[in-house]
Each structure stands twice: as structure tokens, then as C-alpha cells.
């Protein structure tokens, strides 16, 4: 089905002029980002005109929009974007408030009804590992800030050389959160295999050195603590992905020997910068760890990749696939400055004026209408051939049959008859129905000053080819699917 497009009403008037100026600015900005060859100094775009010839549109199919059109980007509408952000923020705030109330109930022994903004902020910071010094110092440790990492995992050894200085661990503190199960907390994990506070774990080591880096779920940042239990937030560290397995502790299986070979090569373990001053304490911890039954299973969990936020499909969403043919008089005016290297490099620059006076275009366009937005793009020749190739082949077959009916005795040349009789010749390959989108670009060039109706210089083919190649590349990069343009309607 063909469509008659009122080209003059769409491209004239204030709206048409504004659209033409936006297209000119867009092409000009793209040329400023293109690396220019040595003989061209700059390229500027001065004007753009739609022309008076309208393109030919033929609808091929009306279907559901592509999935890519439902992905939300940063350039969404302000109203709908703010609604989505507010709804997501309110749900996150409500979940954090519930976790905060459960957290205070577990640690203080009573439940508080209601949370202010500061408590919510502190609760959210605990989940992401961003704990301020005031909030952390208010919590009471289990018994003493000893390195539970030495007991929970044989790979967390204080005798290993430093990898990243200035970071310590807060695994000595037990922070019960509502979103953590019982098997994920240090208390229950240690209780499965016996208490670490035996004769081999003196309380005196709490003042001798700092602890190893580690956070729940591997999302936290290490913090440095002194004797007053103050935290320093200036030393970030790599996240640890070590998860303890209480099952191994319950069976009392020791795997220190199996993990001793790769202890110093574990890239997920981060050590502090006080190991040199606490060598004796580190050896004591090492001997105590050999007598205990540590766990040695570390689950390497990679963080899931964020999935793009998708809009909800609606029954009124639709997509139009149409064939676009255009052989019009669109105009684009550019200037490029050519550098002459004689008698010295960049001796003089000559302005070259290029006027694109027409474009021949043949391709498949996709227009999707979703929630007051119109998405426009073109399909590549391969995609267009796969989508509409069979239909175009049927049309071409019907046209050939009509030609044969009009000329029942066609003449064949000698080369075709020879190829048909030769069995070694390969059959002709199926020809692609869709070629390049921009099939032809007509350009007029003018360089230097005109004297007596003649140009001062000629043979500017290199500059013309460069500019035309860039015009093709900009069009293919910005308009060919999966790239598309969105218009608010």
C-alpha cells in the first residue's frame, strides 16, 4: 500500500526550518569528531534543505514494535521518567526502612516504629558497605575485634605479603541485618564448627594488629580501625567474594593443607599494611589456625550484569515497516579547508566548497509508535533482504512474466549460450535485492577563487570522496538499526 506524503507541509514553515537547522547542527557536530586526513584542516556544514521532491513510501507490514524500542534511555520524557524514578525510589526506601526496623530490633532488643532519613541512610550504607564512623562505633562487637577471617578461611592469612596497603576488616563485628539469612552471618557460621574464642585465640591479639579485608556478599569496602574502634573511610579496597560454608565446619573437616599452595595467590584477598609490625601475632594466629578446623570453600560469585529497564507493552503500540525510495533534490552545503605543503608544510589553506545537490536512496524504514513517542530507523541491506526478500522476489518474478508475455521470443547473446552449455560454469549466485542505502550522492565542488569563469585549482577528488564517505558513515551509524531516532509526538 502506497502513501501520499505532503512533503511541503512537513518541511516548510517554522517547524520545518527548525528541523532543518537541527539536522545541520547534528551533521556539523559529527564532522568535528571525525579524524581528518593530513591535507584537510577543517570541515564545516553551513546549510541544509529538504528540497521539493517527496520520497515514495510503500507499507509492507504492520506489526508489534521491536524489543529494542522498549528500552528506557537517559533521554526519556521528564514526566514519565520522574514517575518511574519516584516509584523505584519509594519502593527501595520502604524496603530499607523495614530492614532498618528489623536491624534495630535484633541489636537493641526492642522495635522502633518509624525511621528518619538519617537512619535510612545509615541502613542503606551498611548494605553497600559505606558505613560511617559514627554508625559503626555505636555497634557492640561479639567479644573483641579479632580476625574472624583467619578462623573462617585458611586462605586469609596474615603472613602473606601486603597486596593493597591501608585497608583492614570489620569482620570482627557482628551486624545482624534483616536481609541476611542465618547461614550468612559470622556468628552462625562459626557456631557450626566450635567457638573461635578458645585457648588458641587470646584477647590480647585485638590490640596487636588489624584485621583482614572482607564484607558480606563481597560488596563492601575495607575500613581501617584503631584502638578506639574509629573507622577511616579514606582507604577503599577491592571487594571480597569469600562466602563461608557452615556445613564444612559442622563436620570438622580441615582443608588447610589443600589450600596452603594457593594462599598467597588468591586475588580476592586484601591485606592490611600493619603485617610488618605484628609478625609475632601473625605467627600466633597461624599456629592457632592450624589447630582449629577452618573452612576452605570459597564461592566466586560474579555480580550480575544490570539489565536494562524495559517499558511495559501496551495494546495500542504498533510498528510500520515500509519501503522508502527517494531520488530528490535535498541540499547540503559544506566547506573544507585544504592545506598545501609546498614550499613548506601547511603553507597555505584553500577553502573548498562542496554542495550536495541530490541523493538517491532505496531502503526499508521502521516507524514504531510507543507512548507518545515515534521511533525511526532503517534496516541494513542484509536485514531488509531477510525481511522482505521473498516478497520482492515474487514481485520481480511477476514483472519478468509480464515482460515475457509482451516479448514471447527474447533474443539471447552468444556469451549466455556458451555459459549454459558449459557444465563447468557455476550457476549464478542469488542477487541481493537491497543494495546500499545511499546509492548515489550528487555533489558540486568549487575551490579557490573563480577567474574568468574557471576555477583556480582542479582535481579535488580526494576531498570529495572523503566528505562523501563521512556522510555515508554518519547516516549508517545514526539511522541504521539498532540505532534509531526518537521523536515526541
Curated annotation (Swiss-Prot):
What's the protein's topology in the membrane? Peripheral membrane protein
Where is the sequence biased in composition, kind Acidic residues? 72-82
A Pfam family matched in the record: MMM1
Q: Which InterPro entries match?
A: Mdm12, MMM1_dom, SMP_LBD
Q: Which residues form the SMP-LTD domain?
A: 1-489
> Which keywords annotate this record?
Endoplasmic reticulum, Lipid transport, Lipid-binding, Membrane, Mitochondrion, Mitochondrion outer membrane, Transport
Specify residue ranges for compositional bias: Polar residues: 231-249
**Gene Ontology molecular function:** lipid binding
Q: What is said about its interaction partners and assembly?
A: Component of the ER-mitochondria encounter structure (ERMES) or MDM complex, composed of MMM1, MDM10, mdm12 and MDM34. A MMM1 homodimer associates with one molecule of mdm12 on each side in a pairwise head-to-tail manner, and the SMP-LTD domains of MMM1 and mdm12 generate a continuous hydrophobic tunnel for phospholipid trafficking.
Domain notes for this protein = The SMP-LTD domain is a barrel-like domain that can bind various types of glycerophospholipids in its interior and mediate their transfer between two adjacent bilayers.
Full protein name: Mitochondrial distribution and morphology protein 12
The encoding gene: mdm12
Amino acid at each position: 500500500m502506497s502513501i501520499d506524503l505532503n512533503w511541503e507541509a512537513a518541511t516548510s514553515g517554522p517547524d520545518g526550518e527548525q528541523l532543518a537547522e537541527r539536522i545541520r547542527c547534528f551533521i556539523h557536530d559529527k564532522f568535528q569528531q571525525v579524524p581528518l586526513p593530513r591535507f584537510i584542516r577543517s570541515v564545516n556544514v553551513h546549510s541544509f534543505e529538504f528540497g521539493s521532491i517527496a520520497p515514495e513510501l510503500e507499507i509492507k507490514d504492520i506489526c508489534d514494535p521491536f524489543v529494542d524500542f522498549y528500552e528506557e534511555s537517559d533521554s526519556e520524557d521528564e514526566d514519565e521518567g520522574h514517575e518511574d524514578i519516584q516509584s523505584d525510589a519509594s519502593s527501595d526506601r520502604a524496603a530499607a526502612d523495614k530492614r532498618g526496623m528489623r536491624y534495630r530490633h535484633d541489636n537493641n532488643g526492642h522495635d522502633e516504629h518509624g525511621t528518619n532519613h538519617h537512619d535510612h541512610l545509615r541502613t542503606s550504607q551498611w548494605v553497600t558497605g559505606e558505613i560511617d564512623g559514627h554508625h559503626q562505633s555505636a555497634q557492640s562487637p561479639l567479644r573483641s575485634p579479632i580476625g574472624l577471617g583467619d578462623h573462617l578461611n585458611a586462605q586469609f592469612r596474615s603472613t602473606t605479603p601486603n597486596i593493597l596497603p591501608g585497608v583492614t576488616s570489620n569482620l570482627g563485628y557482628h551486624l545482624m541485618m534483616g536481609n541476611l539469612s542465618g547461614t550468612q552471618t559470622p556468628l552462625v557460621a562459626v557456631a557450626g564448627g566450635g567457638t573461635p574464642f578458645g585457648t588458641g585465640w587470646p584477647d590480647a591479639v585485638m590490640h596487636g594488629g588489624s584485621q583482614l579485608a572482607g564484607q558480606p556478599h563481597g560488596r563492601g569496602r575495607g575500613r581501617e580501625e584503631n584502638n578506639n574502634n574509629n573507622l577511616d573511610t579514606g582507604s577503599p579496597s577491592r571487594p571480597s567474594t569469600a562466602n563461608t560454608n557452615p556445613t564444612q565446619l559442622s563436620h570438622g573437616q580441615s582443608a588447610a593443607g589443600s589450600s596452603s599452595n594457593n594462599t598467597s595467590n588468591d586475588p580476592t584477598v586484601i591485606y592490611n599494611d600493619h603485617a610488618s609490625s605484628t609478625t609475632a601475632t601473625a605467627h600466633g594466629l597461624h599456629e592457632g589456625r592450624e589447630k582449629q578446623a577452618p573452612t576452605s570453600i570459597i564461592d566466586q560469585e560474579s555480580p550480575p550484569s544490570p539489565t536494562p529497564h524495559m517499558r511495559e507493552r501496551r495494546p495500542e503500540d504498533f510498528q510500520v515497516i515500509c519501503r522508502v525510495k527517494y531520488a530528490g533534490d535535498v541540499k547540503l552545503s559544506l566547506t573544507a579547508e585544504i592545506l598545501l605543503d609546498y614550499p613548506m608544510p601547511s603553507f597555505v589553506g584553500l577553502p573548498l566548497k562542496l554542495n550536495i545537490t541530490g541523493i538517491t536512496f532505496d531502503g526499508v524504514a521502521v516507524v514504531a509508535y510507543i507512548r507518545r513517542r515515534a521511533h525511526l530507523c532503517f534496516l541494513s541491506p542484509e536485514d531488509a533482504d531477510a525481511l522482505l526478500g521473498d516478497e520482492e522476489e515474487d514481485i520481480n518474478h511477476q514483472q519478468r512474466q509480464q515482460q515475457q508475455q509482451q516479448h514471447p521470443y527474447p533474443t539471447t547473446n552468444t556469451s549466455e549460450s556458451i555459459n549454459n552449455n558449459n557444465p563447468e560454469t557455476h550457476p549464478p549466485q542469488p542477487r541481493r535485492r537491497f543494495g546500499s542505502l545511499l546509492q548515489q550522492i550528487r555533489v558540486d565542488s568549487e575551490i579557490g577563487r573563480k577567474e574568468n569563469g574557471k576555477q583556480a585549482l582542479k582535481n579535488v577528488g580526494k576531498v570529495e570522496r572523503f566528505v562523501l564517505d563521512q556522510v555515508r558513515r554518519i547516516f549508517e551509524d545514526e539511522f541504521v538499526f539498532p540505532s534509531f531516532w526518537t521523536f515526541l509526538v
